C-alpha cells in the first residue's frame, strides 16, 4: 500500500478559533456539539471562516465470499440489485444525496455480477467478490492495494472538482462480518461482543454467524505468524468496497478534506485506517451511532462523538448524509452569528 502523508492540523490556530466561538452572542458552550464541530472544521481548513464546497458521496459496492457461509439474512444477489436500483435513483442514499446536494458516485469495486451495461456505475471491479475468509485470505495484498488506489483516485477526482467535504458508503451483503472481526482484532474486544444481527438475523442465525466468525479468526491466527498485525488483517478479511473506502478516507485526510463517517461498516474502515495512520481521525466527522450491535463500542475506541442517534442501520452512507445539515449549521454558526461587541450586547460571562 502507498505511503500517505497525513498531518494533524496546526494547533497554533486553535486558540483564536475557540475565542471566536466563545465570543459569539450566546452563552459559552450553549450550542453544544455545534461548537465542537465548528472548531473541528475550522481546524481542518485552518481558517476562522470555513466553507463546505461541492460535497461528494462515494458509494462502493462489493460482494463477500463469507456470505456463502450463511452469515447474512440477505442473499448476495441483493448487492447487484441494489447497485442497479441506485442508478435509477431509488435508494435511500439517492434520496439523501438529492436532499443535501451531494454528487453521488456509484462504484463497482467487486460485485459478483456484470454491471457494465449500466454507465452510471463506475467499473472498478477487481474481482467478482472476495474469496471466503473462513478458509483463505479474502484478497491478495496486490488486490487490496489496487482497491486502496481506486479509492484515492476517486477522492482526487472529487477534490479536483472543488470538493472539500466527502462521505463514503457501501453496498455489500455480509460486510458486517469483516467489520466485526476488525473491531475484535483492533479493539481487543471479545469477538462475540462485536457481532450483531446485520440486516436482521434471528437468534439461531446470529449464533451461527458467531460460530463461523470465531472459526475464521482461529484460522487466521493459524495461517498468519504475526496474527493481529493490521497490515495482515486488512486484506485477509476486507471487502473490495471496504478497501476502497479505506483508501478514500486516507487520501481525503491527506488532502485536508472533511470526512463524513457513516455507520458500523464505514466506522470499521475508519478504525482500520486509524491503525495505520492515527492522524486520519482529526479529519473524521462521525455522522451517527447506529443500531448495529457494537457500533457504540467501536466509536468509543476512536473517542468519537456521533452527531445523530436515530437507530439507523441501513448503511450506504445514509446516516452520515443525514448528519450533514448539522455540520452545515455548525459552519453557518461560526460564520454568520454576531459577536457581543458588534451586537452591542453585554458579555455576561
Label each PLM-derived region with a short phrase.
Residues 1-349:
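N-terminal loops that bind phosphate or other acidic moieties
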Amino acid at each position: 500500500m502507498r505511503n500517505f502523508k497525513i498531518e494533524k492540523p496546526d494547533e497554533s490556530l486553535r486558540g483564536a478559533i475557540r475565542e471566536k466561538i466563545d465570543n459569539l452572542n450566546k452563552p459559552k458552550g450553549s450550542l453544544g456539539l455545534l461548537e465542537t464541530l465548528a472548531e473541528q472544521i475550522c481546524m481542518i481548513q485552518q481558517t476562522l471562516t470555513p466553507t463546505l464546497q461541492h460535497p461528494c458521496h462515494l458509494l462502493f459496492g462489493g460482494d463477500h465470499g463469507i456470505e456463502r457461509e450463511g452469515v447474512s439474512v440477505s442473499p448476495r444477489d441483493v448487492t447487484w440489485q441494489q447497485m442497479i436500483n441506485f442508478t435509477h435513483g431509488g435508494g435511500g442514499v439517492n434520496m439523501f444525496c438529492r436532499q443535501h446536494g451531494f454528487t453521488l458516485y456509484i462504484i463497482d469495486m467487486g460485485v459478483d455480477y456484470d454491471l457494465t451495461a449500466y454507465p452510471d456505475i463506475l467499473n472498478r471491479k477487481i474481482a467478482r467478490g472476495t474469496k471466503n475468509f473462513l478458509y483463505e485470505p479474502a484478497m491478495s495484498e496486490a488486490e487490496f492495494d489496487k482497491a486502496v488506489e481506486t479509492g484515492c483516485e476517486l477522492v482526487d477526482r472529487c477534490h479536483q472538482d472543488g470538493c472539500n467535504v466527502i462521505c463514503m458508503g457501501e453496498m455489500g451483503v455480509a460486510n458486517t462480518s469483516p467489520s466485526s472481526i476488525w473491531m475484535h482484532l483492533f479493539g481487543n474486544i471479545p469477538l462475540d461482543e462485536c457481532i450483531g444481527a446485520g440486516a436482521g438475523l434471528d437468534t439461531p442465525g446470529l449464533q451461527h454467524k458467531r460460530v463461523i466468525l470465531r472459526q475464521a479468526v482461529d484460522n487466521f491466527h493459524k495461517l498468519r505468524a504475526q496474527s493481529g498485525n493490521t497490515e495482515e488483517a486488512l486484506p485477509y478479511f476486507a471487502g473490495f468496497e471496504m478497501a476502497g473506502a479505506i483508501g478514500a478516507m486516507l487520501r481525503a485526510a491527506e488532502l485536508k478534506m472533511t470526512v463524513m463517517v457513516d455507520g458500523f461498516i464505514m466506522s470499521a474502515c475508519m478504525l482500520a485506517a486509524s491503525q495505520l495512520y492515527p492522524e486520519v481521525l482529526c479529519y473524521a466527522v462521525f455522522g451517527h451511532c447506529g443500531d448495529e450491535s457494537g457500533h457504540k463500542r467501536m466509536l468509543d475506541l476512536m473517542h468519537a462523538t456521533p452527531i445523530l442517534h436515530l437507530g439507523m442501520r441501513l448503511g450506504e452512507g445514509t446516516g452520515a448524509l443525514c448528519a450533514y445539515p448539522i455540520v452545515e449549521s455548525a459552519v453557518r454558526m461560526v460564520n454568520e452569528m454576531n459577536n457581543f461587541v458588534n451586537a452591542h450586547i453585554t458579555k455576561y460571562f
